[in-house]
């Protein structure tokens, strides 16, 4: 498994190019310490202090435990490095202004549960954690508003495929 990136994610905002997140210290994230990795995962902040675009699903990862983030960091450090340098994102104006992501975060970034479940036992709570956090299921299976925020009142109810081909299915218990 080499996490060299390069995949292009088409959206209404333009095209995001998946970065190299291999252990290469120059082209990848190999020079990041655990604090930098955690800050990216949980707050969407790069080591240089700039906002990461929410095409990286930190809006879900913010729900991950510190231990799970540390374990993921340790695992990724064991994977092969790649010196592949990827193209920059190709975003439409004004989405190309990275500073505006701070406003998006103000509106949409929080670690509240997406669904309130009364009297959930440990198994249900763990499943909710996996779906809402590391699994980041809602990032594709939930429709978005005009600013790219998740329509949480339609949580996991299916969404248009951002690449324009078909739909991402409804995965709610009452779905088709």
Where are these regions (language model features)?
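Electrostatic cytochrome c docking/interface patches
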Residues: 103-132
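Extended, well-folded interaction surfaces typified by the phenylalanyl-tRNA synthetase beta subunit core
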Residues: 84-99
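The canonical Cys-X-X-Cys-His
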Residues: 1, 37, 72, 127-130, ...
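Ligand-binding pocket scaffold of soluble enzyme catalytic domains
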Residues: 51, 76-79, 83-84
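Electron-transfer interface patches adjacent to heme c in soluble/periplasmic c-type cytochromes
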Residues: 8-39, 59-69, 154-176
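Detector for the c-type heme attachment site
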Residues: 1, 42-43, 57, 77-78, ...
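Small/polar (Gly/Ser/Thr/Ala-rich) solvent-exposed segments
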Residues: 145-157
């Amino acid at each position: 498994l080499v996490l060299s990136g390069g995949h292009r994610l088409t959206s209404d905002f333009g095209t995001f190019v998946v970065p190299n997140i291999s252990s290469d210290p120059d082209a990848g994230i190999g020079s990041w310490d655990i604090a930098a990795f955690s800050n990216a995962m949980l707050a969407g902040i790069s080591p240089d202090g700039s906002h990461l675009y929410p095409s990286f699903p930190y809006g879900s990862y913010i729900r991950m435990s510190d231990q799970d983030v540390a374990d993921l960091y340790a695992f990724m450090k064991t994977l092969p490095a790649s010196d592949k340098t990827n193209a920059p994102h190709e975003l439409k104006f004004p989405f190309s202004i990275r500073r505006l992501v701070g406003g998006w975060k103000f509106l949409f970034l929080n670690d509240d549960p997406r669904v309130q479940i009364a009297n959930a036992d440990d198994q249900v709570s763990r499943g909710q954690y996996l779906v809402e956090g590391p699994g980041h299921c809602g990032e594709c299976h939930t429709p978005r508003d005009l600013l790219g925020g998740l329509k949480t009142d339609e949580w996991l109810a299916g969404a248009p495929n951002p690449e324009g081909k078909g739909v991402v299915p409804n995965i709610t218990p009452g779905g088709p």
